[in-house]
């Protein structure tokens, strides 16, 4: 209930609601599946719409992808969020931090991983991880957003 109250007080007043918008989506941040989180001015968001019931498979893909980035000591960070309510509850969101639009080129080709996974994990494991991604991901949508700190509230500083 506290999440809904917080949303009603602090988030919904800032949303542009049209006639087709009927509910909020709630995202849960996954520290365990994110890699080297960083503050950002802009973010390239990649919404991965997965097949219902494939959550554990997609988590296995995410763990493999993070492992490959760790082995490769990648400089490209990402944050993982799971949409847990609303019209698309089987959606995972990747947030790649950017300072300028040109930074998007470093995140645009990551998809299922390709050569990046193979170099870090070997061909057999990269193929296995990529097969999981191809099997459970129905579609993907991308978006660029700007961070709006004035619309954020700090944890523990919620006013009643």
Task: Kindly give the residue locations of the regions a language model identified.
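Short S/T/G/P-rich N-terminal loop/turn motif that feeds into the first structured element of a domain
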Residues: 1-160
């Amino acid at each position: 209930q506290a999440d809904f109250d917080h949303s009603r007080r602090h988030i919904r007043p800032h949303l542009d609601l049209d006639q087709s918008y009927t509910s909020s989506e709630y995202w849960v941040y996954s520290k365990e599946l994110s890699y080297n989180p960083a503050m950002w001015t802009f973010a390239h968001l990649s919404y991965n719409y997965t097949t219902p019931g494939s959550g554990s498979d997609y988590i296995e893909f995410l763990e493999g992808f993070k492992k490959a980035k760790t082995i490769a000591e990648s400089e490209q960070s990402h944050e993982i969020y799971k949409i847990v309510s609303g019209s698309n509850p089987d959606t995972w969101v990747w947030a790649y931090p950017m300072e300028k639009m040109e930074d998007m080129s470093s995140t645009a080709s990551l998809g299922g991983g390709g050569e990046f996974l193979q170099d870090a994990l070997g061909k057999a494991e990269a193929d296995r991880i990529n097969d999981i991604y191809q099997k459970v991901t129905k579609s993907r949508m991308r978006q660029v957003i700007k961070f709006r700190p004035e619309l954020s509230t700090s944890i523990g500083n919620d006013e009643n």
